[in-house]
């Protein structure tokens, strides 16, 4: 049996027919940039996420940059980010001339450690970027309270958490701006690069719309610094069709997540990263911590089971960001060293999940 990390083919079968019709209509209209489908997608995303405003952008990375620009992050400002995240969370801050201040994460779920964040807030702190890693949301209610008290922006990098909730609320109900990525492998993925920013603040919304289009407040007239970060109409067409199935897919992911957690929780040799009890995760990833992960992954590969790592290096273990490291940070390094992601996607059958679990137990010589 061969088990893949993701399966994009099954979803394509569902949207193929309607997608072809949309493409033919688009090619006839030739409205490839900010065409009608972009506004339709933004409306659909706002509705499904129960948020007032959505701005479609060209990638998850550009979503963060657009959000930072909208929050007036400038040179020498400090922005607190977790050490365990994708490169762009940190690089977006540096590209604006600001300084990333690195915080540790929690070993239980991989999200940023809020106590560590509080210790790092200074008069120069202008924003905190929380990261909903693996689909797990941090305690955004507590972070929101801190940010309100300190009068700083709260931005959530939700590239992996589309559809996740904390206290039965979506991330943008707590944040100034929430960002997401529609990279193909995401819970809601396009057929290329795309992303979005969500906010309930009209002023920030209007600024982000201008920023994503070279800072133009009207055609050929720039009133603020911006960039070319518009979502293209082709990807909007894809996402409109895929959204029709997203609730069902997230439900199935959550079911699989529960099976993994239930069946693996008794294995002492591994530690399963799990969201806190108030978080309803979207089933983006199943992550375990294990010693000698390469040996384990080679074994799983020999049994036909694909695995992955998110991520092999923390932000400050990489040359670009090495000078921002904090020697007291330990949890993120431990996760980077030992994390293994197991296969999960909405079209995975129960017998396939059972096979993955069976292989893990055999690796540890555990008999039922």
Descriptions of predicted regions:
Residues 30-78, 92-96, 102-104, 169:
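Phosphate-binding glycine-rich loop
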Residues 69-149, 153-158, 165:
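PLP-dependent aminotransferase-like
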Residues 92-93, 146, 170, 187, ...:
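Hydrophobic/aromatic ligand-binding patch that stacks against planar heteroaromatic rings
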Residues 63, 85, 91, 343-346:
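Conserved SAM-binding loop
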Residues 1-31, 36, 343:
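N-terminal "arm"/small-domain region of PLP-dependent enzymes with the aminotransferase-like
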Residues 55, 80, 101, 154-155, ...:
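Structural detector of well-ordered beta-strand residues that form the stable sheet scaffold
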Residues 156-191, 206, 218-223:
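Conserved active-site segment immediately N-terminal to the catalytic lysine
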Residues 9, 21, 36-43, 48-52, ...:
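PLP-dependent aminotransferase class I/II
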């Amino acid at each position: 049996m061969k088990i893949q990390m993701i399966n994009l083919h099954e979803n394509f079968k569902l949207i193929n027919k309607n997608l072809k019709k949309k493409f033919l209509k688009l090619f006839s209209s030739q409205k490839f940039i900010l065409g009608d489908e972009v506004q339709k997608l933004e409306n659909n995303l706002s509705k499904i996420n129960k948020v007032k405003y959505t701005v479609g952008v060209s990638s998850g990375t550009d979503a963060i940059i657009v959000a930072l620009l909208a929050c007036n992050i400038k040179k020498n400002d400090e922005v607190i980010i977790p050490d365990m995240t994708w490169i762009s969370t940190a690089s977006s801050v540096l590209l604006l001339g600001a300084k990333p201040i690195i915080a540790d994460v929690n070993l239980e779920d991989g999200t940023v450690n809020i106590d560590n964040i509080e210790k790092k807030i200074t008069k120069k702190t202008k924003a905190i970027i929380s990261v909903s890693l693996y689909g797990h949301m941090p305690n955004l209610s507590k972070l929101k309270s801190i940010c309100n008290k300190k009068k700083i922006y709260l931005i959530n990098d939700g590239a992996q958490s589309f559809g996740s909730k904390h206290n039965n609320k979506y991330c943008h109900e707590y944040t100034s701006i929430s960002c997401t990525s529609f990279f193909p492998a995401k819970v809601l993925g396009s057929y290329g690069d795309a992303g979005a920013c969500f906010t309930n603040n009209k002023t920030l919304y209007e600024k982000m719309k201008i920023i994503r289009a070279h800072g133009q407040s009207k055609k050929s007239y720039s009133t603020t610094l911006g960039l070319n970060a518009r979502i293209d109409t082709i990807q909007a067409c894809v996402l409109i069709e895929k959204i029709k199935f997203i609730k069902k897919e997230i439900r199935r992911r959550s079911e699989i997540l529960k099976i993994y957690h239930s069946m693996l929780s008794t294995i002492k040799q591994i530690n399963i990263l799990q969201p806190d009890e108030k978080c309803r995760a979207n089933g983006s990833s199943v992550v375990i911590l294990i010693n000698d992960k390469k040996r384990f992954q080679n074994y799983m590969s020999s049994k036909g089971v694909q695995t992955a790592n998110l991520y092999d290096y923390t932000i400050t273990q990489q040359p670009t960001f090495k000078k921002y490291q904090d020697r007291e940070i330990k949890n993120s390094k431990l996760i980077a060293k030992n994390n293994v992601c197991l296969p999960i996607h909405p079209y995975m059958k129960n017998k396939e999940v059972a096979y993955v679990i069976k292989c893990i137990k055999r690796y540890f010589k555990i008999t039922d």
